[in-house]
Structures are given as structure tokens and as C-alpha cells.
């Protein structure tokens, strides 16, 4: 199932123009009778017109949101879906989401101050 979700997001992100789902969470993953996972609910999806552009609106569900969405004026790209997908994987492994005590909470202030989400993902400062 995890691979199905990743392939679904890859499909969205590699389309021309690419699509950012923006609300990837467990309740938006449907399972077929054969056990295949399918991404659903594209109500918040955004079509990106440029590979270099950043989206600037706050959307999604808090427990699955990437840290860059917590900024007062968020700028983000397809990587927010990757982060949300990781939260779905966490939920699949743990059978629940953590009680708002995310390991990256310590980074929250740094991200809001610096708006440097690229170094958050790459580890480069």
C-alpha cells in the first residue's frame, strides 16, 4: 500500500502541469477490493503552471501538514505532499498519529523565522 501511495503522488507530481494534492491523509486513501491503495479527494488539489513556482495558500489537515505550511505566508511545492505521505506511513506503522508531539516541532520556530524549507528537507544550512 505504501508503494501505491508513493506511485500515485509521483504520477501527480510528474504530470505537465504538475498537481499538488495538498491534503494527503489516511482518510483520503482508498483501498480497492484487491488491496491496492488509491489517492482520493482532490478538492484541495492545485495545478502548478511552472516547475519553479511556489504555491502560497494555506490548506490541508493540520496533523498531516508539512512544517512550511505553518508559516504566516506559506510558500511551498510538491514536497508538502511527500511530507504528508510520510505522516500516512507513520500512521500505518503506529496505528495512530502522535498526539501533536511531532519530532520536528523543535524546528517549527526556525522554519517560521527563516522560511528556509529547502535546508529542512536537504539538511543543508
Give the positions of each predicted feature.
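Conserved activation segment of eukaryotic-like protein kinases, specifically the C-terminal portion
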Residues: 55-68
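Catalytic-loop of the protein kinase fold
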Residues: 16-31
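C-terminal lobe of the eukaryotic/viral protein kinase catalytic domain
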Residues: 97-125
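Conserved end of the kinase activation segment
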Residues: 69-79
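Protein kinase catalytic-loop region centered on the HRD/HxD motif
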Residues: 7-19
